[in-house]
């Protein structure tokens, strides 16, 4: 599974210049930040041979959505075994999301909008289509936990004061 879900290597991170199209962590809602942080921290826990759900538990209890860590573990485990190619999950300290992290966040946002078929179709590009719906079911449960805790996946627009 670790071969399919990977971090960006440090040389690639050094060579990469900030793209206008990359989504930044500071532009995400609290729910979006928690989701991306969880993907990244899940991978760190797997690499350290620690149980990922246990490693994430305190953050989810503090966020008011206990059991979110279990759903993240299920989603990431399924993606790890069913992905068609290596999935890029970036280092916890990275400010910009990878294309794969952006795709996963987009799928959650589609689920929040009730667009289950569209979310599954987007996931088909990343993983074996037969399991896309399973990931969507689990991700939708996760989305529900976030919403019940007051953590939306869509961020408010960036506002500036105009005088």
PLM features: residue spans?
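Polar/charged low-complexity regulatory segments
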Residues: 1-163
């Amino acid at each position: 599974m670790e071969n399919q879900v990977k971090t960006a290597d440090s040389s690639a991170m050094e060579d990469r210049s900030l793209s206008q199209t990359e989504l930044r962590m500071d532009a995400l809602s609290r729910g979006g930040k928690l989701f991306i942080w969880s993907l990244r921290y899940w991978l760190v826990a797997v690499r350290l041979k620690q149980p990922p759900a246990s490693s994430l538990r305190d953050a989810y209890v503090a966020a008011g959505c206990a059991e979110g860590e279990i759903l993240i573990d299920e989603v990431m485990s399924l993606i790890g075994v069913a992905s068609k190619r290596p999935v890029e999950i970036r280092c916890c300290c990275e400010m910009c999301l990878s294309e794969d992290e952006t795709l996963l966040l987009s799928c959650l946002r589609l689920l929040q909008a009730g667009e289950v078929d569209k979310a599954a179709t987007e996931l088909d590009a990343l993983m074996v289509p037969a399991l896309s719906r399973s990931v969507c079911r689990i991700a939708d449960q996760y989305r529900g936990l976030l919403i019940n805790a007051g953590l939306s996946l869509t961020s408010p627009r960036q506002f500036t004061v105009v005088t």
